[in-house]
UniProtKB/Swiss-Prot annotation:
Protein name: Large ribosomal subunit protein uL2
Region ranges (Disordered): 219-276
Basic residues: compositionally biased ranges: 252-276
InterPro entries documented for this protein: NA-bd_OB-fold, Rib_uL2_dom2, Ribosomal_uL2, Ribosomal_uL2_bac/org-type, Ribosomal_uL2_C, Ribosomal_uL2_CS, Ribosomal_uL2_dom3, Ribosomal_uL2_RNA-bd_dom
Natural source organism: Acholeplasma laidlawii (strain PG-8A)
SMART domains, sorted: Ribosomal_L2, Ribosomal_L2_C
GO cellular component: large ribosomal subunit
A GO molecular-function annotation: transferase activity
Annotated function: One of the primary rRNA binding proteins. Required for association of the 30S and 50S subunits to form the 70S ribosome, for tRNA binding and peptide bond formation. It has been suggested to have peptidyltransferase activity; this is somewhat controversial. Makes several contacts with the 16S rRNA in the 70S ribosome.
PANTHER family: LARGE RIBOSOMAL SUBUNIT PROTEIN UL2M, RIBOSOMAL PROTEIN L2
GO biological process terms on file: cytoplasmic translation
Record keyword Ribosomal protein present: yes
Subunit structure: Part of the 50S ribosomal subunit. Forms a bridge to the 30S subunit in the 70S ribosome.
Amino acid sequence: MAVKIYKRTTNGRRNMSVLTFDEITTSTPEKSLLAPITKTGGRNNQGKLTVRHIGGGAKRKYRIIDFKRDKDNVPGKVTSIEYDPNRTANIALITYLDGEKRYIIAPKGLQVGALIVSGSEIDIKVGNALPVMSIPVGTIVHNIELKPGRGGQIARSAGTSAQILGREEKYVLVRLQSGEVRRILGTCKATIGEVGNESHELVRIGKAGRTRHLGVRPTVRGSVMNPNDHPHGGGEGKQPIGRKQQMTPWGKKARGIKTRDKKKASTSMIVRRRNG
């Protein structure tokens, strides 16, 4: 998908860019696969703020995506490629031979009219989903399950992918884009190909208003807050933070501290840590 850069007609338009949406074939979603989505403003069920910088944004409906790809050995035809406001990747509407319709994440190169299928003994073709144990070494995949039947959890964003590196007994080694090498149970499913809409990372938002339309609120520096709001706050005018190192808003060290739980069960599945 190409990127269109606007001319410098105003300060907001200067070097602003948008996707051209050449791959999108319809602007009307499948009504049976829509669900209401309620805005939370970053609050939990107690009304407490749990995620900062969330609020507002354009109204949207959730598209129900088939991450499990559990409709085995039933061919489906790609009916349309659509925009999804809830994710960076595009989605593809699949109509199966028995008449059922489902959305999947649209891989790079998937065209309207193409046939895809899920199963254990099928062709290695873009859009097909099969257990990672059945995928040849070196194949690029996305939408990878961490537990069989739970649905894909890894490599779902625009332009992301992973690569099958090898096999270890009942596990398969997968290298993620971060450089992390991870063991995946061989019965977990993955989809062939990389996620499409890889130009998404090239888009320049250009102005604050576009970010607000996306439902993202402003980020305020801790140094300009009051001391009761942030450890960096307070002082007359511009002041140093007054501490040996940077802190989070909750008073914890913000640099050089590992944030992953040391007792996390899946740590044993990580063969090599991610780069950086």
